[in-house]
Amino acid sequence: MAWPKLPAPWLLLCTWLPAGCLSLLVTVQHTERYVTLFASIILKCDYTTSAQLQDVVVTWRFKSFCKDPIFDYYSASYQAALSLGQDPSNDCNDNQREVRIVAQRRGQNEPVLGVDYRQRKITIQNRADLVINEVMWWDHGVYYCTIEAPGDTSGDPDKEVKLIVLHWLTVIFIILGALLLLLLIGVCWCQCCPQYCCCYIRCPCCPARCCCPEEALARHRYMKQAQALGPQMMEKPLYWGADRSSQVSSYPMHPLLQRDLSLRSSLPQMPMTQTTNHPPIANGVLEYLEKELRNLNLAQPLPPDLKARFGHPCSMLSSLGSEVVERRFIHLPPLIRDLSSSRRTSDSLHQQWLTPIPSRPWDLREGRRQHHYPDFHQELQDRGPKSWALERRELDPSWSGRHRSSRLNGSPIHWSDRDSLSDVPSSIEARWQPSHPPFRSRCQERPRRPSPRESTQRHGRRRRHRSYSPPLPSGLSSWSSEEDKERQPQSWGAHRRRSHSPHWPEEKPPSYRSLDVTPGKNSRKKGSVERRSEKDSSHSGRSVVI
């Protein structure tokens, strides 16, 4: 039996089909991929074979670039290879670059990672796709997908994929991101000015001026205060300088409204005219306050009754508190004694005593100074006898001779001579009084110098330092203690009786109660103060301020 002859094309087709169906074919989707650091990427790879799938072995190999396609792209050698139609990044032997096995899988088994990729998150999925999680710096290179199928010896068993890792771009992005962050902070800093930024820092958006001007910062703080005081001002009426405890008063907000505390405490409350429609925003509140301050007439004179009460300037006592302190001057007359006609001084001495001396009120501050400064008091005691002797020598020239002769004889100084000086002003006053009555009033406020004996008595008795009365006027007065009277000679008593003033028949002068006790104090305390004032103020010829 003879087989029919087949035409030549059919014979060629039948010969080619078994060979084409039994060959191996590998394909890739992208031949070049770009990725950044720490990103994930999938390299696609597929194949066709006539062998069994469980016998197919898929292997991914890594080969580094011969020349870097990023950094060496603009070099002369790289451009010359491109002009010749070559690939300078991959056209080199394997001994000139690094070659590593990434992963390998047989059939449907689990992939096995290479030695250099054991700690990496790399796997093979689907038929031959390579998955790389967290791309590193050294993953930059060429990846080869190789398929090994038993029985298929023909065809193209591998394909290459270029993986370009933009590590340099990542570094640039990090630097640019930091610069953008700083720029953003600077812009926000300028936009928030002057509320939240620090002064004297120049921003990039406004380098010609300061970031925080002081005027804008003060305006912002003032607006904050006005917003905080706005709701309270809408509810309560405003009082001009009368409500000190209220926060709605305009006194602490404007320095021109500051007055004396004593004056403000007694001013009547005058409610100011308040508009009914208030603007809801903070700028309106500020404008309202400025308008009220402009309408306030500070130059308007006070009423006549207030002028009469507050015409005098503010004293030291009244400035310490809001209460008006009333001061009272109590003038005590001096102690007057007559002097015999044989002891009277000349007309020059008479004119010297008639010279008016400006009076200085003996106020509470001098008493406190004597109490708190004993050194000053001791200096006054040490200086007392010497200054008294000099004044006695000036007033009575004959006394210096008697004093010198008495010292040569060894006899002590008589108290009658020592007391003669204290009688001079009183006798002159007694002689001058009929023709010149005002002399008594002028002499009442003249301060007296303390005598040595009185200074010694006050040095021995420290209690008198707490008194508000001035020191004693002369050497030995009529109110000496009983011990001093016993030690005095009999002639002194007779002389004292002759030198008494006709105005005071008694030995002791009348006592003066010169204490104005503040109401509301304790009665026991008032009694003690009165007794001490009666004891000490009767010894004084000065003015006492209570």
Swiss-Prot record:
Belongs to the immunoglobulin superfamily. LISCH7 family. Residues 458-467 have a biased composition (Basic residues). Its main location: membrane. GO terms for biological process: epithelial structure maintenance; positive regulation of peptide hormone secretion; protein localization to tricellular tight junction; regulation of RNA splicing; response to fatty acid; tricellular tight junction assembly. InterPro entries: Ig-like_dom_sf, Ig-like_domain-LISCH7, Ig-like_fold, Ig_sub, LISCH7. This is Immunoglobulin-like domain-containing receptor 1. Keywords: Cell junction, Cell membrane, Cytoplasm, Disulfide bond, Immunoglobulin domain, Membrane, Nucleus, Phosphoprotein, Receptor, Signal, Tight junction, Transmembrane, Transmembrane helix. It comes from Pongo abelii.
